[in-house]
Amino acid sequence: MQDMLGGGRAEGLFPGQYFHVGGDEVNTKCWEEVEHVKAWMAARNLTTTGAYGYFVNRVLEQVRGHGREAIAWEEVYKHHKASIPKDTIIHLWLGDGENLKNIVNDGFRVIVSNYKHWYLPQLWETWDYYYGNDL
């Protein structure tokens, strides 16, 4: 992460104000099968969910430390809303209007990319399907 945001080989590669950290579709099952990862989690008394939260918060801290605004997928909010900084921008893609309302009411800013209407690999849809999205 340090290389991507500044001070490393990739410095300047992502020069914008915002940095999307991802955080969706994380499969933590493999963490339970790797001995050194299991030992690391046990030493910190973390479950796989806790380790995921630890990692997410470390990444968000690094992004903020470089003066950037962090964007994270909706799953980060879903699993870690109590621990992530309120200045994290949540990128909503799975949810509906109710999810949007909850995220905003919890004090987060939101980018809406509802997959039902904005998942562009659905090339069989016509332009009016996308244009008529009224989340």
Predicted regions and their residues:
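Active-site neighborhood of glycoside hydrolase catalytic domains
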Residues: M1-T88, W93-R109
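Aromatic-lined glycan-binding groove of carbohydrate-active enzymes
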Residues: E98-L135
